């Protein structure tokens, strides 16, 4: 098998007949010719991305994603002595707080928006997941000097040239916390764009799969966070099941199936515990930016009916991120369904699109004919 590192899939097309191959087009990050693969079977493991929810001041320099802060650390960014607030929801905040503390940052507050009772119940359920419980305890010990407050969330970031402080709400009261950096994020969103390009059904924001991890499109399998947020252990088990099924296994291994069921129960508890609270919607003012790429404020989209209208009238979702940041935010704020997915799935060079067009032409397809409008 050929292995291509440093490449991103930009288009994937389902065959017109059962005996025809799938066509997958990828682009190399460092240049070079596009990669075109004809495959009998496709396994999607597209992972997830951070979910950002708008609030006043979230576009200030110094406000970064929780996962983004971790990536900056790995790239050598300097946090020594900087006052950091970490706010949002989910277990990812703990290892990031530990990493920042280890890098010399002063973590002055970790604000978890989930209610205290819900988090306590979730922690008690980890008695059946001793490894996860031990890991969480170790992370907490790593930033023991910083308060970890439940039922607490940032309502505003304040500053001139960059963030200087945040306003936090807790127990019906607000207070100001001085900081140099705000790391924020509200969990993860499954990456389903490639699955939708192939015509796979999506339910509750994740790729729908059978017990063998097969999607609604025959010979296309999916595993990991694309099928729902559940953590590394669940992703690995799903990957084993999907790989075996793609290789011809009729049913998943019974031990793997039991392990998957247990981890899926954990994932459902995770989703219930750390679901963003309704109060976060009320933070967004008329002038608050909801689409950073195109500088679109809430007032410009609040009267519109869906993501398509937002694109037509305001260009929200048409910037560099192609709706990956503002899309989930607008869905949360207004209850909109996900917008239409069109190729390329990732920004691509013209040369790659040309190769894609030549590759799809024999099948009577073009890079722009493969469009999924539903979810």
Residue ranges and their predicted role:
Residues 286-301, 314-332:
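Local cysteine-cluster metal-coordination motifs and their immediate loop/turn environment
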Residues 4-26, 103-193, 201-203:
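A Rossmann-like FAD-binding core segment of flavoenzymes
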Residues 1-83, 167-174, 183-184, 194-196, ...:
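FAD-binding core/adjacent interface of flavoenzyme oxidoreductases
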Residues 214-216, 244-284:
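Active-site-proximal substrate-binding core of FAD-dependent oxidoreductases
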Residues 64-73, 155, 162, 181-230, ...:
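FAD-site-proximal beta/loop scaffold in flavoenzymes
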Residues 61, 76-119:
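Rossmann-like NAD(P)H-binding beta-loop-alpha module
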Residues 176, 278-287, 304-320:
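Immediate flanking context of iron-sulfur cluster ligation sites
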Residues 223-258:
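A conserved FAD-binding loop/helix module that cradles the flavin
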């Amino acid at each position: 098998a050929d292995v291509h590192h440093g490449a991103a899939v930009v288009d994937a097309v389902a065959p017109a007949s059962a005996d025809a191959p799938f066509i997958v087009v990828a682009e190399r990050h460092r240049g070079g010719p596009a990669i075109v693969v004809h495959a009998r079977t496709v396994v999607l493991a597209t992972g997830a991305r951070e979910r950002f929810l708008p609030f006043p001041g979230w576009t200030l320099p110094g406000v970064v994603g929780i996962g983004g802060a971790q990536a900056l650390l790995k790239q050598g960014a300097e946090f020594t002595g900087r006052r950091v607030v970490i706010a949002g929801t989910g277990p990812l905040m703990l290892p990031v707080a530990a990493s920042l503390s280890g890098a010399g940052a002063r973590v002055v507050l970790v604000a978890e928006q989930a209610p205290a009772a819900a988090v306590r119940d979730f922690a008690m359920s980890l008695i059946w997941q001793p490894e996860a419980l031990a890991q969480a305890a170790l992370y907490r010990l790593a930033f023991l000097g910083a308060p970890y407050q439940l039922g607490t969330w940032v309502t505003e970031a304040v500053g001139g040239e960059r963030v200087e402080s945040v306003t936090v709400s807790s127990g019906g009261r607000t207070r100001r916390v001085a900081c140099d950096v705000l790391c924020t994020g509200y969990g993860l969103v499954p990456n389903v764009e490639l699955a939708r390009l192939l015509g796979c059904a999506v339910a509750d924001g994740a790729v729908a799969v059978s017990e063998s991890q097969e999607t609604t499109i025959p010979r296309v399998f999916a595993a990991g966070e694309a099928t729902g947020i559940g953590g590394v252990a669940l992703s690995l088990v799903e990957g084993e099941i999907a790989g075996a099924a793609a290789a011809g296994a009729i049913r998943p291994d019974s031990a793997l199936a039991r392990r998957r069921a247990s981890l899926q129960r954990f994932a459902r508890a995770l989703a219930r515990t750390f679901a963003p609270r309704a109060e976060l919607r009320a933070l967004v003012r008329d002038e608050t930016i909801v689409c950073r790429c195109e500088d679109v404020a809430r007032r410009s989209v609040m009267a519109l009916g869906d993501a398509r209208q937002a694109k037509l009238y305001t260009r929200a979702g048409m910037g560099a991120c192609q709706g990956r940041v503002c899309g989930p935010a607008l869905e949360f704020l207004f209850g909109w369904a996900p917008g239409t997915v069109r190729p390329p799935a990732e920004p691509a060079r013209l040369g790659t699109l040309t190769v894609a067009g030549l590759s799809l032409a024999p099948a009577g397809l073009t890079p722009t004919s493969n469009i999924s409008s539903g979810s």
